[in-house]
Amino acid sequence: EGNADFIIDDFKEASINTDYILTSENEETGQAFITVTDEGQNTILVYGGANMTLNAEDVNHGEQAIREADFVVAQLEIPIEAIEQAFKIAKAHGVTTILNPAPAIDLPDSLLSLTDIIIPNETEAERLSGISIKNEADMQQTVDYFFERGISTVLITLGEQGTYFATQHDSHIVPAYQVKAIDTTAAGDTFIGAFVSRLERDLSNLEDAIRFANQASSLTVQRKGAQASIPTYKEVTAQYQ
């Protein structure tokens, strides 16, 4: 339907490769309906639509792209089956897998064990681990939960506080840039995209990539809208300190 054509054209205009996008004859394009409070906080109602029909066989059609990627990134607005298949292909070819477990749902260990880097917010981290994060000890216990399931790098986004990250060798908070938020819609998505776009394949610049992502998100929350509020790589680079 019209939304599919509009979105694909929008991607092409942004120089995004659309070769592996599939279209459905039976389902409409997924949509998100967003409300924003006066304080800039949002509530999102999602209609999955065609997104929720993606399966392992569909993912196999994109195997070449996965094999050649620096990173494979997924969130939870497609079926778990599809994510697991994409991550299995990635792991088989030495490609780093990154999971943004949003929206917050329970996840099988089979998916977590295929994940190299996980990036939840506090709510999502608590949902997965069952640990209420109230202090640094709770944070470390949450990180250990993910480590025990084979995940090597954990980033927990903390809103205006910044991002807590942990590896087997280091852990601390990377502070956020202090700005006045108008609309927090797309802040998390901006963080993920900016982080991955900056990250070196060997993860050697992990903290730099987090700072860059924090900068990108700080620009997003000062603007209204979802996709329209997301800055370009060039915009973020110009602001990055």
Feature annotation, model-predicted:
Residues 19-24, 34-71, 76:
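Conserved phosphate-binding/catalytic loop of the ribokinase/pfkB sugar-kinase fold
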